[in-house]
Regions:
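N-terminal amphipathic/hydrophobic interface segments
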Residues: 15-158
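Sec-dependent bacterial lipoprotein signal peptides
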Residues: 1-15
Length: 158
């Protein structure tokens, strides 16, 4: 019997309770994650942009959404006519303003044939303007190529 008591005590002392961390309290963890997402940004019910990404992380307290897998954004005018498309490696959307910053190999192509290349590009949803302070390259259908630093335009690149 003493051997069983000793073995029982050894068994109990070897069992420990694993501590479970509350993941929601960890800084930097998203509140929600989704894959293969489509986000529609509207202004008073009118579609202004349709955002697609392979992966989304939503941070409620910080009020932003991180898109980090092949982002594609289709822009629309006030009559919901397609005007341009933007692609990037990743993007952040400010949920309070619906502003978006695209980052990494950003390419914006207007339906009129103008193409903009940059490392980052911000879309101000209220003003419906694209802008950057980065180096840019613009190509046109007439085979013109322009280089510069900084850029601002309507989302249709006119």
């Amino acid at each position: 019997m003493p051997i069983i008591s000793v073995l029982f005590l050894v068994f109990l002392s070897s069992c420990t309770r694993d501590t479970v961390q509350d993941l929601s309290s960890r800084e930097g963890m998203p509140d929600q994650e989704s894959w293969g997402v489509i986000i529609i940004l509207t202004d008073e019910g009118t579609i202004r942009a349709k955002v697609r990404s392979g992966h989304l992380e939503k941070y409620n307290e910080k009020e932003f959404v991180m898109l980090d897998s092949n982002v594609t954004v289709d822009f629309f005018d006030s009559k919901e006519q397609h005007t341009s498309v933007l692609t990037s490696e990743k993007a952040e959307i400010n949920q309070a303003s619906n502003d978006m910053e695209a980052m990494g190999n950003v390419v914006a192509v207007s339906d009129s044939g103008i193409t903009l290349y940059s490392e980052s590009l911000t879309w101000n949803s209220r003003e419906e303007k694209l802008h950057t302070k980065e180096n840019i390259m613009i190509t046109t259908l007439e085979t013109d190529t322009l280089y510069g630093v900084g850029f601002e335009s309507d989302s249709d690149l006119k």
